[in-house]
């Protein structure tokens, strides 16, 4: 895995995943770790700038194929079918991630337009796309304003249905 340029990174990643799942080194969590290794490997190879490719949804949607193809590699050496499955998963997952990113961008721009005349609330919108958890204290910190000003900004976000209070404490 540390030798570059022998095989394309996605192919190496698919091979690595089968090897890890075959070894099955832990009593619990092998599946989660195996899927995380895909993301970490692609980040280490600088194929991902952020850990935004996680194949769990694809694997869950095609679970019987996943287990059947892993087994076929072990019993029949059928790497071709496994590689097609894996690359299809990467393609579908990357396409979905791209769509989600575009939707989030459109949503953020919609909120920004909605709040263009409310500078404090507008400043919090961008922060919400970094971390969607907001408290009045954190809002005051982000805005570098007082707690009453931060609370007023959050109230504007609530009135515009951008955030809602969940804790019962405000």
Where are these regions (language model features)?
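Phosphate/pyrophosphate-binding active-site loops
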Residues: 1-101
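Hydrophobic, well-ordered secondary-structure elements that form the walls
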Residues: 86, 139, 150
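Short alpha-helical segments that sit at the start of domains
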Residues: 97-125
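Short acidic, hydrophobic short linear motifs in intrinsically disordered regions
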Residues: 123-125, 130-143
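Basic amphipathic alpha-helical segments that dock to polyanions
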Residues: 128, 150-160
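Short, Lys/Arg-rich nucleic-acid/phosphate-binding segment
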Residues: 167-170
């Amino acid at each position: 895995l540390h030798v570059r340029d022998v095989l394309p990174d996605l192919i190496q990643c698919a091979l690595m995943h089968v090897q890890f799942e075959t070894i099955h080194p832990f009593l619990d969590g092998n599946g989660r770790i195996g899927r995380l290794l895909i993301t970490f490997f692609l980040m280490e190879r600088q194929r991902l700038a952020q850990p935004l490719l996680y194949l769990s949804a694809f694997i869950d949607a095609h679970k019987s194929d996943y287990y059947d193809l892993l087994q076929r590699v072990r019993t029949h050496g059928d790497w071709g079918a496994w590689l097609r499955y894996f690359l299809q998963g990467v393609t579908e997952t990357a396409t979905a991630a791209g769509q989600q990113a575009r939707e989030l961008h459109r949503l953020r721009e919609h909120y920004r337009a909605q709040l263009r005349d409310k500078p404090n609330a507008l400043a919090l919108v961008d922060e919400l796309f970094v971390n969607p958890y907001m408290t009045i204290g954190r809002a005051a910190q982000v805005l570098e304003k007082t707690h009453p000003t931060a609370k007023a900004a959050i109230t504007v976000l609530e009135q515009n249905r951008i955030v809602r209070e969940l804790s019962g404490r405000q």
